[in-house]
Amino acid sequence: MGKTLLKQVQEVVSEAVEDIRSLGLPPLGAEFAQLHGTDLHQALIAHRATKGFERPNVRGSARRRESSVRGFLDTNASLTTQFNYWDLAAPDRRSFLGARAWLSGVLTDFVPTYRFAFPSGEGVISEQGMTDFFHKLSLDSQWTVSIDAVPYAARIAYRNASLKRVVRERFRAQFPYHWRRMARGWYEEAQKKKLRDPGLHSFTYMFAGCCDIVGVSRITTVPKNNEKDRVITCEPTWNMVAQLSLALDLRECLRRRTGISIQFWQEVHKSLIRSGRATVDFSDASNRNIWSVVKALFPRRVVRHLEKLRNALFEYDGEYYPVNMLAPMGCGFTFDMLTLTLLAYARQFDPAASAFGDDIILSQESAAPFMEFVEKLGWKVNHSKTYVAGNFRESCGAFCDLGEDKLLLSYDLLWPDDEQACYVLGNKISRLVKTLNRGPVRDILVRCYERLHSCFPRDAYAEDDGGDLCDWLFFTEEEGCTNAARSTAVQLWSAMWQRPIELRSASESRAVEGNAVKHDIDNVRLACFLRRGASYGIPTGKFKESRITRDKKSGETLSGVTLVSIL
């Protein structure tokens, strides 16, 4: 049934997307500033519905990957390696020095804490998707670090009791006969040099002995669309740990001095766009933070750590390329450095400017001089998606109609590749139908929504409670499953819970399993029975329908729902 459901949903939604595309509504860009009301909302939904809904082109993946990587390397090669702020015009030099002074104040109490944070993603040595850090620690090939990052990474492991133990045990296993003499020699060497922490000195050598030294970042890609891939880099494992640790310290300085907390600032930006301030969008921002400019902009106490933790070489297809940018996505501190850099520039034109990565919000009168200034420093402003005037604003994936003072609900409709994705896609369309009042886009979505009802089983029908998009229920107001009666015990116990327990009864068809081996079974099943001494529960070919009672909100069976609140 899963394959049939998948094919049906793909066909139904594909037809709807093509109908929406035929309307010829403008794509997301400068024209949106002139739209308002239902016309604006329809154009936004149409853009997001059509831009990403396409069957994955597997045949062209190699060519697309090569083209994307070459474009990335060309961008890197075009960045300047020499920067002197004295070459800037006087007004621009004043803004640059103001940004440097602002950063010096924000980072005045920056001190590395060497805290540990779990890295994610592939390392410089690929593990084919096995990115769990505990898994990496069990593999010799994943113990990688650049030579300059060894002291920083070793300090992180030294200050974490569990990592410290792992390193010591690994060192003992690698040098079972000499580890004690080697560690004692390093410790005595530190004592002779009167170092502050001889134990750390000895541990650093032990840590380096456990690792392979890798001085490059591996270039790879992740799918974006059928025209272009997103290029990222894969770092040595312990470089990733050190980069994330440094990023957390930078975030803490930013939070203490400005009140901007990266952890939840995306949600703040989604609210700030309703103020009507200008929103500035950049193209390829993470790849245009020039390293020579960063060295002149940030305090030396930060730059010296950046120098040690970033790799100065890219590796791709056996060739090596110097890194002229700070670091692309894939490096642990790229996003935080991007936020600090652009925020420092924006604050020179608007003291109330805000930044989250490359999403900038500032006053309308400050937008033009800000964009002119950053373009002189190598940044590329996406003018088609930058909104200074008009009724439309966009930031961090949120869209606002200033004329009606409301956020516009919209979704990216993506090609489903499994049954769970079908449910999510269907629920997106369900919510879009409810949020639109009228218009040709709504008419198309309504027809699509009605056809989807025949695709999903009625037992999956459920009311939309306004929560997350569900991947096992289809949101509809039609009756599907029957409401199950609650026993007296459930009613009493659920009264002590934070919410009342509502039950729904759904039918499920399953094969009836036999409990005994028959004489007419084949030889393979008989051999299995003789070896095991019991039946494997071989299906008899008959199907039996059973009713399963589940919690209406969570989908859990009643036995899995805690009915008593300890609070």
Residue ranges and their predicted role:
Residues 1-229, 291, 369, 433-567:
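C-terminal, non-catalytic extensions of nucleic-acid polymerases
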